[in-house]
Swiss-Prot record:
The active site is at E285, C319. It comes from Homo sapiens. This is Aldehyde dehydrogenase X, mitochondrial. The record marks N186 as: Transition state stabilizer. ALDHs play a major role in the detoxification of alcohol-derived acetaldehyde. They are involved in the metabolism of corticosteroids, biogenic amines, neurotransmitters, and lipid peroxidation. It is an enzyme of class 1 (oxidoreductase). GO terms for cellular component: cytosol; mitochondrial matrix; mitochondrion; nucleoplasm. Residues 1-17 form a transit peptide. Its EC number is 1.2.1.3. PANTHER family: ALDEHYDE DEHYDROGENASE-RELATED (PTHR11699).
Length: 517
């Protein structure tokens, strides 16, 4: 699962080049205040109707940070009602100039930039990702995505069409309406920006359900939405669980569209709920088992580095992680040796320390899931070359893990692990590896490493994936569409294509007395 703005998953050194010394990075706030723990509905902070709360946990220590409101169906109803009222004809939001919507988004970006250190610290506390990545990558991307779509606000429009006969015809791009958005825990602020920015730029209203594992940064951003000047009801933020609050959004007959980022299994449920309710529009960005293919003529050092970061970045918790590394037979042994050495050198530890490269998994459930897959890989006959166990005595840390001798029919080769586990495969021929790479239910991303342009172009056409990288990995910007083939989802986010998901095209035809060219 996520993304945006500045190139994302380059080597740690490359990704944080502007902050190449500890002095260049600001010091994190180790114990940030938590001012917001309620639901944000109609620009007001409210308790859940049930008065229930649930804990959010620091994955570095396993200790509870605090409790937030547990929203459910009744709260979703309140939020949808507020969003519907904000979207009614003649409301301040509907009457607002498109350029003013863009100004509000730019104002929101300004406020995020003002509070960047605090937001990055909050993200690291609640999610566990290294602070230097929260600050230098995620927050950079968040700011840019709001600014990018702010620029689109008054430039997304229809066109005139030269019809036959005495008619004048034009199209309008109108907002879909009330948009339900359900975001994941691996990139909380980034995913919030991916969904909010295009929806607001095109004039929609939003009911967003944030991940129960990482609610804190999204709630703080809600306070910035109010400070920026968005009218009441335009953005509503619900904290709660997927089977209750998330399901209520997907099933709600007064929600016009739902956008979801998360697992393929839940994506199936959301698609079904949309069909069973009001046939609401659906955008899904789901799981992946993305291949990285290394040919014998590739720059070995560069390919090792890129394939390492493609998998281990964000603790392996990326929907587009390069979780199947295919290496041509003639260089396989050397590549494997270098890969293992690279994994052993990766620094795991306290994410608030500025030289940490890998923090904990997001929660106990993910921690146990990943360890379970490691045990399964060993049981199935893959060769464990490094890692494979817990790091430290508390928190949810796992040592960077590399498997060799992996076969395509093993579960670690087919299923999304979503953790720091890199399986390596050997191949002989290009046609063979293309067939194997495509032999998956997923199709989110892929990469090929080669110096041969003809081979590179062949792979870009042959691989079944929404994004194909050549000699790099995880370069995702706010200008470029992102989404998957097959069971990795439908629709696209980001770029001009990302706006299409949030508008309806209306055709207007007018009878005229006389038409002139």
């Amino acid at each position: 699962m996520l993304r945006f703005l500045a190139p994302r998953l380059l080597s740690l050194q490359g990704r944080t080049a502007r902050y190449s010394s500890a002095a260049a990075l600001p010091s994190p706030i180790l114990n940030p205040d938590i001012p917001y723990n309620q639901l944000f509905i109609n620009n007001e902070w409210q308790d859940a109707v049930s008065k229930k709360t649930f804990p959010t946990v620091n994955p570095t220590t396993g200790e509870v940070i605090g409790h937030v409101a547990e929203g459910d169906r009744a709260d979703v109803d309140r939020a949808v009602k507020a969003a519907r009222e904000a979207f009614r004809l003649g409301s301040p939001w509907r009457r607002m100039d498109a350029s003013e919507r863009g100004r509000l988004l730019n104002r929101l970006a300004d406020l995020v930039e003002r509070d960047r250190v605090y937001l990055a610290s909050l993200e690291t506390l609640d999610n566990g990702k290294p602070f230097q990545e929260s600050y230098a990558l995620d927050l950079d991307e968040v700011i840019k995505v709001y600014r990018y779509f702010a620029g689109w606000a008054d430039k997304w429009h229809g066109k005139t069409i030269p019809m036959d006969g005495q008619h004048f015809c034009f199209t309008r791009h109108e907002p879909v309406g009330v948009c339900g958005q359900i975001i994941p825990w691996n990139f909380p602020l980034v995913m919030q920006g991916w969904k909010l920015a295009p929806a607001l730029a095109t004039g929609n209203t939003v009911v967003m359900k944030v991940a129960e594992q990482t609610p804190l940064s999204a709630l703080y951003l809600a306070s910035l939405i109010k400070e920026a000047g968005f009218p009441p009801g335009v953005v509503n933020i619900i904290t709660g669980y997927g089977p209750t609050a998330g399901a209520a959004i997907a099933q709600h007959v007064d929600v016009d569209k739902v956008a979801f980022t998360g697992s393929t299994e839940v994506g199936h449920l959301i698609q079904k709920a949309a069909g069973d309710s009001n046939l609401k529009r659906v955008t899904l960005e789901l799981g992946g088992k993305s291949p990285s293919i290394v040919l014998a003529d590739a720059d070995m050092e560069h390919a090792v580095e890129q394939c390492h970061e493609a998998l281990f970045f964000n603790m392996g918790q990326c929907c587009c992680a390069g979780s199947r590394t295919f290496v041509e037979e003639s260089i396989y042994n050397e590549f494997l040796e270098r890969t293992v050495e690279k994994a052993k050198q990766r620094k795991v530890g306290n994410p608030f320390e500025l030289d940490t490269q890998q923090g904990p998994q997001v929660d106990k459930e993910q921690f146990e899931r990943v360890l379970g897959y490691i045990q399964l890989g060993q049981k199935e006959g893959a060769k464990l070359l490094c890692g494979g166990e817990r790091f430290g005595e508390r928190g949810f840390f796992i040592k960077p893990t590399v498997f060799g001798g992996v076969q395509d029919d093993m579960r670690i080769a087919k299923e999304e692990i979503f953790g720091p586990v890199q399986p390596l495969f050997k191949f002989k021929k290009i046609e063979e590896v293309v067939e194997r790479a495509n032999n998956t239910r997923y199709g989110l991303a892929a990469a090929v490493f080669t110096r041969d342009l003809d081979k590179a172009m062949y792979f870009t056409q042959a691989l079944q994936a929404g994004t194909v990288w050549v000699n790099t990995y995880n370069i995702v910007t706010c200008h470029t569409p992102f989404g998957g083939f097959k069971e990795s989802g439908n629709g696209r986010e980001l770029g001009e294509d990302g706006l299409k998901a949030y508008t309806e095209v209306k055709t207007v035809t007018i009878k005229v007395p006389q038409k002139n060219s």
